[in-house]
Design a protein with these regions (language model features):
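A ligand-binding cleft/hinge motif common to bilobed small-molecule-binding domains
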Residues: 55-76
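Structural recognition of the beta-strand scaffold that forms the well-ordered cores
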Residues: 4, 37-38, 47, 54-59, ...
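Periplasmic-binding protein-like
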Residues: 26-30, 37, 75-99, 145-146
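Mature extracytoplasmic/periplasmic domains
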Residues: 98-158
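Conserved C-terminal helix/tail region of periplasmic/extracytoplasmic solute-binding proteins
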Residues: 46, 154-184
Length: 184
């Protein structure tokens, strides 16, 4: 995800494998390292909850969790989630059943259960990540339904891209460049 931030800042596709572009992104990431307190999501989340950091790159569901924790702690600061004007990434968690699954019927029943509106709403409340289930969405409080961090509008989504699998060679390139960023 760190590379995505630099790619969007520089106007590159988040799935680029262009070495010149990625070197430029790497240089940006190295230049901003003195400002970074954490890259790992759990550390980022904890620093935001503790008021130690003023800015973070964080998933929308994590931000809802952080906002709830800050409010529950009685802290005297508010946190706002924004999608940068350059855009961000869009991601989707999915449930899949392998074609050779031994208990395919049970897996289908579990997915059907999780897709029930009431259960999807409960799952959303527990994991704090947005639900794509329209019936569950209708059960949410209007404050949550109107939370653009969870449910961005079409204008914000139009600025965002989906990560693609770049193959072993692409993964290796990103891994090598990330090692160089961390080593600095």
């Amino acid at each position: 995800d760190a590379f995505m931030v630099g790619e969007k800042l520089l106007g590159y596709d988040i799935n680029t494998t262009d070495k010149t572009q990625l070197e430029a992104v790497k240089d940006k990431l190295i230049a901003q390292k003195p400002l970074v307190q954490a890259y790992v999501i759990d550390q980022v989340r904890d620093k935001m909850i503790g008021g130690e950091a003023a800015l973070a790159v964080i998933y929308s569901g994590e931000m809802l969790y952080v906002q709830k924790e800050v409010k529950a702690s009685g802290a005297n600061f508010d946190l706002k989630y924004v999608i940068p004007k350059e855009g961000s990434n869009v991601w989707i968690d999915s449930w899949v059943i392998p074609k050779n699954a031994r208990h395919k019927e049970n897996a289908e029943k579990w997915i059907d259960f999780m897709c029930r509106a009431d259960i999807a709403k409960e799952n959303f409340e527990y994991i704090t990540y947005p639900t794509p289930n329209k019936a569950a969405f209708e059960l949410l409080d209007p404050e949550l339904q109107n939370n653009k961090a969870l449910f961005p509008d079409d204008a914000d989504l139009a600025k965002c891209e989906v990560f693609q699998y770049l193959g072993e060679e692409g993964d290796a390139l990103y891994d090598e460049l990330w090692k160089e960023v961390k080593a600095q």
